[in-house]
Regions:
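Short beta-strand
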Residues: 61-63, 97-104, 139-143
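Histidine-centered divalent-metal-coordination microenvironment in nucleic-acid enzymes
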Residues: 74, 96-122, 148-161
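Active-site-adjacent loop/helix surface patches within enzyme catalytic domains
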Residues: 74-76, 81-101
Length: 233
């Protein structure tokens, strides 16, 4: 079935899920909407409807009942985002990440693993990678490193890509800046998905780049750093 690999890649907590009801767009062009948690099993019908673009998009909570996960994400919430420049920076830093366009036009930057790993390891590595890429302060999923389902914890969900497949505009982007079909995304996943040992071995030391404008505004130096990284390739 078409959902099988997609489901295996994005599997998370199975006793609750998220949904998002889109609303109108704001003055900045960002779509408004209502996000909420539904307590119940994540059924095959939900996965299938998501890929078919039927009903609300599916949000999955990455952290499971045993506090492990097989995917995590840096959520870069910027409108009119330059995904290609980000991918160049990712490859320049030799990070095993896949970039997807988010529903707002920003980026969901995924780290995938072939097996469940501790949520604490996933979260800490993604925080370090966000700093390297210049997006410190971005939301990181999983947001929790521990949940207690006995007391009703669920964790936070992330809206998945490929709602209505390519038509939904939430798709992976390859190293050339082109959008990927679902099958092309699966091939990207096969290339970049890591084992636990590979995640532990990811080097996350921030590169020391001399400030272009010593004593200048942080935002200006951040922009200059991104330009330096872009032309290092």
């Amino acid at each position: 079935m078409i959902i099988d690999k997609f489901k295996s890649i994005f599997l998370g907590l199975e006793i609750a899920y998220g949904q998002y009801q889109p609303g109108e767009r704001g003055d900045n062009g960002k779509q408004k909407g209502k996000a909420f948690i539904v307590r119940g099993q994540v059924t095959d019908e939900l996965w299938s409807n998501h890929l078919a673009g039927k009903g609300p998009a599916l949000g999955i909570i990455p952290i499971t009942e045993d506090n492990s996960c097989r995917w995590g994400c840096i959520d870069i919430d910027e409108y009119n985002f330059d995904h290609t420049s980000l991918i160049k920076s990712i490859r320049n830093n030799k990070l095993p990440l896949i970039v997807c366009r988010s529903k707002s036009g920003g980026a969901h930057v995924f780290l995938f693993t072939k097996e469940n790993i501790p949520a604490s390891l996933m979260q800490s590595k993604l925080k370090q990678m966000a700093i390297i890429l210049g997006y410190e302060g971005s939301e990181i999923f999983p947001k929790q490193t521990e949940i207690l389902v006995e007391r009703g914890d669920t964790g936070n969900f992330l809206n998945l890509p490929y709602y209505n497949q390519m038509k939904g505009l939430r798709y992976a982007i390859n190293d050339n800046g082109a959008g990927c079909t679902l099958e092309e995304f699966y091939k990207l996943y096969d290339v970049w998905a890591c084992t636990k040992e590979q995640v532990e071995a990811i080097k996350t030391e921030e590169k020391k780049i001399e400030e272009a404008f010593p004593g200048g505004p942080p935002c200006l130096n951040k922009l200059a750093t991104k330009m330096q990284e872009y032309f290092l390739l």
